[in-house]
UniProtKB/Swiss-Prot annotation:
UniProt lineage: Bacteria, Pseudomonadati, Pseudomonadota, Alphaproteobacteria, Rickettsiales
CDD domains (UniProt xref): Ribosomal_L25_TL5_CTC
Biased composition (Low complexity): 187-208
Domain of life assignment: Bacteria
Pfam family, one: Ribosomal_L25p
Subunit description: Part of the 50S ribosomal subunit; part of the 5S rRNA/L5/L18/L25 subcomplex. Contacts the 5S rRNA. Binds to the 5S rRNA independently of L5 and L18.
GO biological process: translation
UniProt name for this protein: Large ribosomal subunit protein bL25
Region listing for Disordered, in residue ranges: 184-208
NCBIfam families: bL25_bact_ctc, PRK05618.1-2, PRK05943.1
UniProt GO cellular component terms: cytosolic large ribosomal subunit
Species this protein is from: Ehrlichia ruminantium (strain Gardel)
Gene3D superfamilies membership: Ribosomal protein L25, beta domain, Ribosomal Protein L25, Chain P
Length: 208
């Protein structure tokens, strides 16, 4: 595990919980939060609104290990949920999960599609169809991926890229409901689709 994969934040323990104390924290520029996990008692904490927002905007926190410094103690966690105000969109509460470095975790990772302009099928007028923009994976905390790259350069019309085509580390397992799902396809050219649609419309009219 390298420093590049860890986001560090400061946190403080909450002495009081509930609606009233949480409102007071928010008025004072803090965000109420909780850390939970198997075989661990929930930990009620609060974060600096300013610090959390700066980290939240600069990194995909959902795919980073977070080192929470709570007083003199450090806890490694994952961010699992953020609650926002329905009107102001201000962050109201954050849920974290304790991490056991020897236990695999499940996490959703974004797919990054590269070389679309070099894609053989797109150059020939094909239509790019992206079916999945994220993947659910299982791995140890030190093997978390911030993103997964999907290279479109050699994708031709009528062909697809599946999960099995990805070059994933051996310690990462994809956990999706569908076995070996299709991630992206290249369908026929736009003109072909327009022609096909026109022919279908004509046939329907003649049957009427």
């Amino acid at each position: 595990m390298t420093d590049q994969t860890i986001v560090k934040m400061n946190a403080e323990l909450r002495n009081s919980v509930g609606t009233g104390p949480s409102r007071t924290l928010r008025r004072n520029g803090a965000i109420p939060a909780v850390v939970y996990g198997k075989h661990r008692s929930p930990l009620s904490i609060y974060l600096s609104d300013r610090e959390f927002l700066s980290k939240y905007r600069s990194a995909a926190l959902s795919t980073h290990l977070i080192e929470l410094e709570i007083g003199e103690k450090k806890e490694y966690v994952l961010m699992r949920d953020i609650q926002k105000h329905p009107v102001t969109d201000r962050i109201q509460h954050v849920d974290f999960q304790f991490i056991d470095h020897g236990t695999e975790i499940k996490i959703e990772v974004p797919l990054v599609f590269v070389n679309e302009q070099r894609c053989v099928g797109v150059k020939k007028g094909g239509v790019l169809n992206i079916l999945h923009r994220t993947l659910h994976i299982k791995c140890l905390p030190n093997a978390i991926l911030q993103s997964i790259e999907v290279d479109l350069a050699n994708l031709t019309i009528g062909h697809s890229i599946h999960v099995s085509d990805l070059n994933l580390p051996s310690e990462v397992t994809v956990v999706m409901k569908e076995h070996n799902p299709t991630l992206v396809t290249i369908s026929g050219t736009s003109s072909d689709q327009d022609t096909s649609g026109g022919e279908s419309s004509g046939t329907t009219t003649s049957e009427d």
